[in-house]
Amino acid sequence: MEKVIELKNVDKHFGTNHVLNKISLTINSGQLVGLIGPSGAGKSTLIAAMLGMLRLDGGQVRLLNSDMPNRSALQNIGYMAQNDALYGNLTGLENLSFFGKLMGLSRSVLTDKIHLVSQTVDLQDHLDLRVSQYSGGMKRRLSLAIALLSDAPLLILDEPTVGIDPELRIKIWQELDKLHQQGKTVLITTNVMSEIETVDRLLMLRDGHIIADNTPTFLEKQYQVTNIESVFIKAGERYENNSHI
């Protein structure tokens, strides 16, 4: 199975804060992977490290067989940041068109893709509004739509369902599962424990360490609980106990 993401001893400090502590992991093609952790655990920093957006203090990152940072490799990644990078003076449609052209999509393909992704995130009736008039949740949905525009083999989505109502979250996860079934690799961070049950593989990050890595079902059996929220609590307690030994 092809390795899509490879991290070897990835290390990062911000001053005296050890944000990523020699993290090593491999994500293979076609996997749907969830990354969870408390606020400040290092999730967004780990994503930034994967994408070559920050200078590491140690370790190596490879994405799609390319050493990072690598600008050309980024063209094969659909990325949604935690902070929306949108043009407020443009409409939703103009934002989608602009980013789609940057991805190299032809006009005919782009038209079809915009129709599809705007329906997926339920923005089809709001594309003519300036983004400055969008609510926070609408901006998140537009950012997700932009990430879904490309036919990239790898999607990295940093908390894409924050501020989105439960019904639409279900629809978005159905779309992500469809892309996963098509063979795409999807890495998603979230704090919504209930929606992470459907992933192939769950990573739990705490204090810059991966403290759990397996399927949700395996982890629930390992910790003798019935939901991921309880796994999260139990794994955290075990980590805290071991770290003080």
Language model region names:
Residues 51:
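Helix-to-loop junction immediately C-terminal to a conserved catalytic motif
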Residues 97, 101, 108-126:
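Conserved ABC ATPase "signature" region
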